[in-house]
């Protein structure tokens, strides 16, 4: 691994997101038509295309986003996920057909990470304060209940799946955030008729362009700096970092500990030692899930890189990546499509 050097974003031409699009003047010229869904999944989405999105397609996109959140959001009291969490004796819950590939991906991630990625981690997130009301207050009984190791429900054992039907026997707090945003990006991308487009969902990018788009890799310690620049023409690049979503919890009058949302589902605790990750899936990926839903897979892998061994993930998924650890050392795979600002060792 090599230490990195920080390079400032040119202030007039870079967006400051975890996977930020650089060279905005060039992008505006190549894809001048912009459609924004500012509230989608809490982060917003911006779609740049080379030809206008007609009103019918935009309306269909809005309907899809609404349906998606109504089914999968644990922050909505009227969602299907919320209903599963309220079912005192569990039940059989039928999801839309479009959920099947998402569940397939979670099956694959659960297996590839030996359970470190698990939708049942929603219960741990709630105990740590990342609940529907965003209380950021840890429950008193959290230490005794966090993670599968302490008896929390487990995907495939306590939640069984039959196609797009999930069966439970008690209230279950599920969270599909590890790759849910990327999956919505893929579904929206399928609705576009433009030959060139970029969907930017707060760090999750799906790019189809004739010439590469420059993407700044944001430094998690200083969002005004980049640690590298990726160049992507066709594929998905997703970033993950706790710096965007973290809170402090008081242990006593003098001590606070930092909590974030990237949990290892096995012990239910925030992942340590990694500060940021980037995962890239090319448009010509060979694995069916990656070829059909590249952003979802890249999104899930960017999270999995925090809690699982890279070699273990590569036995299931074909991807390239970069990770930045807490000592400012960066690891990068061969063929990762970025130039990184490295210092000499």
What residues fall within each predicted segment?
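Mature catalytic core of soluble alpha/beta enzymes
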Residues: 2-345
